[in-house]
């Protein structure tokens, strides 16, 4: 990417913005610069493993542990959103669990820089966690992060991603058109409230998701004290959520994204 002037400019701008973020659930960025044409970013050193590695090790997480991790991730993202920064690449690989149990979100500047007009929004990430609007190459905002958080939470409680396939295109189309198998199908006794939170986060229609990350946090905390409660509000299915038609141009955009990797 260093040969791409637009990317370099975007990377420096967004990484510097990320450097202004200080939060217990974010890997802090201390410095951004270049040394004789080599661009670098100095980040907080965290001893630990990624959430992806942790899930692979345990198979699936307990409800309490998954909810606790989701709350911490949400708090980090909420702090970023309050500063006008959208991550756009939320996935277990970009979430670190430190040796003392603290959960931190990383790669803010890189993720945002990769969403410049000259680079596909999926270049830096995995389509397994991308929102429908991202795989279509459209506008993405805080609600895109909410969708990706929902997919991540789904994987934590089931040990699998909801949409998979042999190619990026196949997975992208599933995000756009295929109904998600409820996580309770794979995890017995999954609390009703937590399943509803996951389903609300991962609605294909942006308007049917949570409005803000703080609303996600509130419901996640509520689910810990009222696991079977019916307090998550899901709006009725609209036409946008029922049918998504992919144009030839959009299909071409999807095909130009890198091969899928989970």
Go through each PLM region and give its residues.
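Activation segment signature within eukaryotic-like protein kinase domains
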Residues: 69-70
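AlphaC helix of the eukaryotic protein kinase fold
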Residues: 1-20
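Juxtacatalytic C-terminal regulatory tail of Ser/Thr protein kinases
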Residues: 211-260
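C-terminal lobe helix-coil module of Hanks-type protein kinase domains
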Residues: 128-231
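Activation-segment/catalytic-loop signature of the eukaryotic protein kinase fold
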Residues: 32
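Conserved short submotifs of the Hanks-type protein kinase catalytic core
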Residues: 36-50, 54
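Protein kinase catalytic-loop region centered on the HRD/HxD motif
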Residues: 73-85
């Amino acid at each position: 990417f260093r040969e791409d002037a637009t990317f370099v400019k975007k990377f420096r701008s967004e990484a510097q913005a990320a450097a202004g973020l200080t939060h217990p659930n974010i890997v802090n960025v201390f410095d951004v610069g270049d040394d004789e044409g080599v661009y670098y970013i100095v980040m907080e050193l965290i001893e630990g493993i990624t959430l992806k590695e942790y899930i692979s090790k345990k198979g699936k997480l307990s409800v309490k542990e998954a909810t606790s991790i989701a709350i911490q991730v949400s708090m980090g993202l909420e702090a970023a959103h309050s500063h006008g920064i959208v991550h756009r690449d939320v996935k277990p690989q970009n979430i670190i669990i430190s040796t003392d149990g603290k959960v931190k979100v990383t790669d803010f500047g890189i993720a945002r820089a990769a969403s410049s007009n000259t680079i596909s929004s999926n270049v830096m990430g995995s389509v397994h966690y991308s929102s429908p609007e991202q795989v279509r190459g459209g506008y993405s905002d805080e609600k895109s992060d909410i969708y990706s958080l929902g997919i991540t939470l789904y994987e934590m409680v089931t040990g699998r991603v909801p949409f998979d396939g042999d190619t990026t295109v196949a997975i992208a189309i599933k995000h756009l058109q295929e109904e998600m198998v409820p996580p309770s199908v794979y995890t017995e006794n999954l609390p009703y409230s937590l399943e509803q939170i996951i389903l609300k986060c991962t609605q294909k229609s942006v308007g049917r998701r949570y409005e803000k990350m703080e609303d996600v946090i509130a419901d996640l905390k509520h689910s810990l004290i009222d696991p079977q409660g019916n307090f998550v509000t899901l709006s009725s299915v609209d036409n946008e959520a029922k049918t998504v038609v992919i144009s030839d141009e959009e299909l071409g955009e999807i095909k130009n994204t890198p091969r899928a990797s989970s």
